[in-house]
Swiss-Prot record:
The keyword Cytoplasm applies. GO terms for biological process: gluconeogenesis; glycolytic process. This is Glucose-6-phosphate isomerase. InterPro entries: G6P_isomerase_archaea/bacteria, G6P_isomerase_prok, GPI/OXD, RmlC-like_jellyroll, RmlC_Cupin_sf.
Amino acid sequence: MYKEPLGVKVDFNTGVIPGAKKIVRRLSDMKGYFLDEKSWEELVKKEDPIVYEVYAIEQEEKEGDLNFATTILYPGKVGKEFFFTKGHYHSKKDRAEVYVALKGKGGMLLQTPEGEARWIPMEPGTVVYVPPYWAHRTVNTGDEPFIFLAIYPADAGHDYGTIAERGFSKIVIEENGEVKVVDNPRWKS
């Protein structure tokens, strides 16, 4: 009849949600995502660091329900490129999402299917609205874990394949101590 309400404790300092589904992405899980393939290969062989962890509370995939998750995106770079999440469109493209920065420093890279991109810097307290039809990826531009909360429709789904194949039209790098958003020479329109 009625679904039971749910309350869970989210540790804003660590990003951990006890009892949540946990996903761990290592650098080796992100082959082909970073521009500097040689640096990627060397770092994978040397230590294969964890790039990010996700703690998700998921509902049935049906219209009207909401999922939420925290992500802990660790600091690091491959060449000049900051660590980032794989990024995705929603499988149901007309679904939106909200992100809330809890700790650390980073940003959200967003892109339309045509490659029009936006960069939104994030720090604790920043709320980002991801409109329908936009791909999105978070980037850690700081020197500590970047932790954020995401809230999204339970039936949105994740289309990682399009990003794995085409990439983003922009990448986020460090150049002369500054965060720069530059064209991705490997982007496939």
